[in-house]
């Protein structure tokens, strides 16, 4: 996916950022839940598996995976049937969990400093900086969409690399050089490699 996604602290903060809740000032909501998730990551009494499960439960409530999946598929989304769209959202949710939540052990105690926010109707952008232990500053941007009385994150950008944009370019390349069916096949292979035999793919939150 690109260099930034493999940086341990950035991965941890991506997960921390993927937490917003009741509508209000987006930054204050992100800040409140950032503290919650950061306490989970910093808790020495929790095992890695327990931390992953705790973070997953928080993140799945506040990350608009349906919107993210739709944007990641780009122009190919409208060409899919409703059942295909539903299947893709499920597969994409598993991909996000495998890529990020499974790697929270890489989190190294980095801190988050908020810089500003922009609200435009039902959309908002919260900008921050990840402060690493090496005193480097990594710019982070969370894009949120208001759904009823909640702000939900649908994209995260780190050092100008967008999660949605990154996946969209990968998915588009596979579809154009092969087919949509090949993309689904690859996602299923990745999912099956990740999921233990006793676990079934988790339906995406509607």
PLM region descriptions:
Residues 25-100:
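Early exported N-terminus immediately downstream of N-terminal targeting peptides
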Residues 94-95, 132, 159-163:
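Solvent-exposed loop/turn segments at secondary-structure junctions
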Residues 18-25:
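Bacterial Sec-dependent signal peptides at the C-terminal "C-region" and cleavage site
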Residues 8-18:
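Bacterial N-terminal signal peptides
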Residues 155-206:
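Low-complexity, intrinsically disordered terminal/linker segments enriched in charged
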Residues 137-165:
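Short beta-strand edge/turn micro-motifs at domain boundaries
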Residues 97-138, 190-206:
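Surface-exposed, charged secondary-structure patches
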Residues 1-6:
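Positively charged n-region of N-terminal signal peptides that target proteins for export
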